[in-house]
Amino acid sequence: MGKYNLILSEYLSFVYNSQSAVQIPIYYSSNSELEKRCIEFHAKCVDSSKKGLSLKSLFEEYKDVIDNATLLSILSYSYDKYNAVERKLVNYAKGKPLEADLTANEIDYENNKITSELFQSAEEYTDSLMDPAILTSLSSNLNAVMFWLERHSNDVADANKIYKRRLDLFTIVASTINKYGVPRHNEKYRYEYEVMKDKPYYLVTWANSSIEMLMSVFSHEDYLIAKELIILSYSNRSTLAKLVSSPMSILVALIDINGTFITNEELELEFSDKYIKAIVPDQIFDELQEMIDNMRKAGLVDIPRMIQEWLVDCSLEKFTLMSKIYSWSFHVGFRKQKMIDAALDQLKTEYTEDVDGEMYNEYTMLIRDEIVKMLEVPVKHDDHLLRDSELAGLLSMSSASNGESRQLKFGRKTIFSTKKNMHVMDDIAHGRYTPGVIPPVNVDRPIPLGRRDVPGRRTRIIFILPYEYFIAQHAVVEKMLSYAKHTREYAEFYSQSNQLLSYGDVTRFLSSNSMVLYTDVSQWDSSQHNTQPFRKGIIMGLDMLSNMTNDPKVVQTLNLYKQTQINLMDSYVQIPDGNVIKKIQYGAVASGEKQTKAANSIANLALIKTVLSRIANKYSFITKIIRVDGDDNYAVLQFNTDVTKQMVQDVSNDVRYIYSRMNAKVKALVSTVGIEIAKRYIAGGKIFFRAGINLLNNEKRGQSTQWDQAAILYSNYIVNKLRGFETDREFILTKIIQMTSVAITGSLRLFPSERVLTTNSTFKVFDSEDFIIEYGTTNDEVYIQRAFMSLSSQKSGIADEIASSQTFKNYVNKLSDQLLISKNVIVSKGIAVTEKAKLNSYAPVYLEKRRAQISALLTMLQKPVSFKSNKITINDILRDIKPFFVTSEANLPIQYRKFMPTLPNNVQYVIQCIGSRTYQIEDSGSKSSISKLISKYSVYKPSIEELYKVISLREQEIQLYLVSLGVPPVDASTYVGSRIYSQDKYKILESYVYNLLSINYGCYQLFDFNSPDLEKLIRIPFKGKIPAVTFILHLYAKLEIINYAIKNGAWISLFCNYPKSEMIKLWKKMWNITALRSPYTSANFFQD
């Protein structure tokens, strides 16, 4: 098993290195004889350690346990209380501590001053501007680095160079921290005033970022980039990331395309050997030079030099360095500003009368027409979703904050909560629920705010609107989104596509006579100038739609939606500033509405169309594509002559002038070869992604536990690695060791082993091999999985109490009654379960469940309870299949060119052999006929788990299920009697299995699973028609082959002779697979 357990035991002896420290390994086995020996071994170890005897002789005596059983966990005692970190740190603090430049940032508190200078007293103090928001501490991070350094101090050759580079960088960090002392965190991993008052305010978050960067250093270039960012980010907490990453928007326009991938008619990527010259007017070079000069002004030396050197020949080979700099710049950490500054940022824009009214008018009309186009069909057909919009809204109501804390009574229990779902229940119980009245957000009821922090940008504010806004918007927005789903212009929503498709779309139309215009419109979206035309466009669209229907319910839905827009035109926000809460009139559009994403996309599309229609007055061209993707829009324009420098310059200046006529402060660029938007950038005909996910600092604190955060950390590490930013894996594993340990008492800790953390159970945190998801099939693996399943679901007294209260029951019954035409236990129970699950975001419930889980886990990690579960997991299925496969060596040549240069070699190799995929595999069941049938008549959306359960019921029961959801009896019986139903069984099973196997996550999402090259490595003689069995056999074979290729860089072929007698058994088993939710799966989901 290896590496993790080895690091674990070494780490424990590194951290607990005093005389009194003891580490006792705990083993388990599925073999009952060996299990007895494991228990004896453990008992004797505990006994000896109590007497203070050495455990060496026991290790000899129980060699059979150590060799044949599986390590479950390590129990560690240490009576030595801390300051161990400080002692070790001194040895590394040999350099000169950094001194912060206290004039580096415009806003006073963004300067890295001593905390007591920024906050005079503990009452004034807030950690919100520097809170790492992660459940691990600076001292742990320091320990992890020092552990790595100690472990590698004797490395030779190239490894020694890496050691020296990291040691040098760590000396800077250690010396600076040592000067002030290591800040101690409290039990919530926060840094209080008492600890911070005599230390620089940003010390902790800076140190975390620096550690993350230095542990990602491999080459000399990495070292130079990291050194510069570490030193400068100590002072510059505001603009560093922006300065360093700005040039990229121009760099992408400088590289000739020599061969690229384009999307063909079948929406696949195919290679095209076209050559396109980068045509760059001098003006663009001047702008780039200005950016580089700004970097130098800010004290950067090496990074601007690297860019300058690259500019000499602008080669694609050396562009990886540019791409690296771009990714690294985000790892300086989040820019966290005070709410007041974030809000006033939007309000600083001066209103000018000198704007082009005609353009604004055109913009508004385009928004109006798009809204009408999106909603015309559902409105004319009196779509049931628009009629029952309120119910649909309630069913998908989130448990996020409603903006104010209220005292609520559930049965005999009185609680305080801000959660929307609880407020709705309470209001319904007390007759205060009036979804037909949208509360104003004017000066009398200003909007409370949330925040969004991103590296390299200013803090943005988020409206926390009353739940009535959500209910009013939900159904209409869902319809808008389903329109966007089949409209190519909306890159973000386009059906099942992924970013590779959008990439091929751009490169497809690039040629010597076309140019691409790309604009970052994030400033415009949140500007005051946008508000009136934007809201008015929506309102006008809704008015037109209201005239297209006679159904009072649909009209009511549209009117409520319109009311939300009217109210928001006159919006005030409340901002805490010190001890006072300021009310400010806020004239701009902010996130927080249900419509945010959809409406912004519509507005951005309208904006670029407005601009293009003006450009068309002056030039003659064909618009080949227009796309909007979040805050960015881009268009490819084809002219009737070859593009020249002068043309690029003219178009560029005209576009900028047109935007300025609308007072839009946006960054608009024109290029012939590449684009750069927030989500991805295309350079030299290849696609790149920014690997900018912070590992040791988080944006905000949620209610995830240390285990969840360990899984998220690993998941972030994987995403970065796929995008070309690699952090040392040993360091990541050390962090996982720290974050998954469980304290029993002050001096007793339990550290789970690799087997516990990598088996896919409810506790899975990471994969033992990066990019490869293994499903254990050995006896010990299945044994531990079963053991964990026995304690997966935890009860919460508070949740039970709330759920048994009249308030809760009435609410669930109200939903069921409105939704169902006749009794349907599955759905009613489903609603109750969903509503009860929403209570999890209420902290006391969460903590209670967590405590129960920890104590169960503690018992388990000391001795697993053998447990005969009747549940079947995906592991059981694969375990049944495995013995019938025979492996032989095979050969698969590299046949595709690289299009994503940042991929790790092993993943790149697999793609080059079998090809990539440009679509998401459907894993939600939404493509099945039963799902479409339900959505035709009901607002209820069953999950893939529920569909999987329902489709395997008896036909009579399926029919009742459908009828109760409002499907006409004749349709229901036709469905059950038709061939469609048996196709559905297969489709849903397929989706469910894909979902279980995380086929759309990690690096699996990049591989073409239907590649003929892959198929020809698999031979399965065809016996009997059970498509589901054939499917699972093939899928298993594909995963085996791909995993082997990732691991070994070589190919195998598989032959399977599956006995017919076993097929029917397997098929029955496949209808009882239990889904396992773990921190690992939720971290994957979190990436989405």
UniProtKB/Swiss-Prot annotation:
Cofactor(s) this protein requires: Mg(2+)
First-level EC class: transferase
EC number: 2.7.7.48
All residue ranges annotated as the RdRp catalytic domain in the record: 501-687
Reactions listed under catalytic activity: RNA(n) + a ribonucleoside 5'-triphosphate = RNA(n+1) + diphosphate
Chief location: virion
Localization per record: Virion
Transmembrane segments: none
Coiled coil (residue ranges): none
Gene3D superfamilies in UniProt: 1.10.357.80, 1.20.120.1390, 3.30.230.140, 3.30.70.2480, Viral RNA-directed RNA polymerase, 4-helical domain
PROSITE patterns: RDRP_DSRNA_REO (PS50523)
One function term, GO molecular function aspect: nucleotide binding
Function in brief: RNA-directed RNA polymerase that is involved in both transcription and genome replication. Together with VP3 capping enzyme, forms an enzyme complex positioned near the channels situated at each of the five-fold vertices of the core. Following infection, the outermost layer of the virus is lost, leaving a double-layered particle (DLP) made up of the core and VP6 shell. VP1 then catalyzes the transcription of fully conservative plus-strand genomic RNAs that are extruded through the DLP's channels into the cytoplasm where they function as mRNAs for translation of viral proteins.
Assembly notes: Interacts with VP3 (Potential). Interacts with VP2; this interaction activates VP1. Interacts with NSP5; this interaction is probably necessary for the formation of functional virus factories. Interacts with NSP2; this interaction is weak.
Entry similarity comment: Belongs to the reoviridae RNA-directed RNA polymerase family.
Listed name of the protein: RNA-directed RNA polymerase
